[in-house]
Amino acid sequence: MPSFQHISFTAHYTAYVWYQMGISHPIFATRQGYYLAKLLRPIDYILEQSQYSSIRQGLLHRHQIIDLELEKLIAQYPKLQVLEIACGLSPRGWAFRKKYPDLCYRELDLAEMAALKQQLLDEIEINPPAVLNTDIFSNEMASVFAQFDSSQPLVIISEGLLNYLTSELMQQLWQNLNRQSSTFQLHYLADLYPYPAQHQRKSVLLAASWLLKQLSKSGFALSMENLQMLQQLAASTGFEKLEILLPSQYLNSPYKDLVWVLHAKRQPSSR
């Protein structure tokens, strides 16, 4: 199992930014997140002086687009099921279960983060479903998917995960998710920060990427230079269709895009 304990570092930062921007519950805003947001604020200030999206705006845009895509899927499939992997301190599970009481929405993360998330959910939700703790790269995922009804569509969400993975690990993850969920009609929602080859503030973004990598002792990187590379990777791992959703088009954002949102789809192989 690859070691991704460092991911919880940025989970605190992201959760605090979401709280600041009014789209999260205060309970997910930690002291650690406050200090991280303060540390990265100067970089965001520089980005906000240009026509390009800042880190904060990127976090907001990706969350909004994933939420809107999920709303569309729920409207299309009333018995839709949701599995959010690497859920971190995202408020999405809590918010959607509150809005849709009958929605089957499960969350999954590494052991330490899963325990923290469970503790926080227990304070704001009545009998929240258990936060799962499973190696997403292993055959153990079969036991996770066994908890869902394969006769109904399933959407897997991973927000803030892919930039911690090399293209090889991303391929392994997508192959495993497709293999273990082969009997489901599958949708997959995720985000990805591409390499800023044409970004006016490229040096600032690369500096921010380096800082996150050093502070979290992780492999965080801005990856995938073009859409064709991503389309090929998705096709090679079992997805039949991949849509790339851009904030400038989807949300009519006046800023040039910093983040992509992915919506991949696949029909079941058998029932």
Q: Where in the sequence are the language-model features?
A:
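Short, glycine-/aromatic-enriched active-site segment of Class I SAM-dependent methyltransferases
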Residues: 203-220
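Core SAM-dependent methyltransferase catalytic element
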Residues: 248-271
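A short, conserved alpha-helix within the catalytic core of class I
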Residues: 141, 164-177, 181
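A short beta-strand submotif of the Rossmann-like class I SAM-dependent methyltransferase core
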Residues: 155-158, 170
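Conserved beta-strand signature within the Rossmann-like core of class I S-adenosyl-L-methionine
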Residues: 155, 181-196
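Rossmann-like AdoMet
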Residues: 1-83, 89-134
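Short amphipathic alpha-helix with an adjacent loop that forms part of the alpha/beta core around
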Residues: 140-150
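Short alpha-helix
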Residues: 220-242
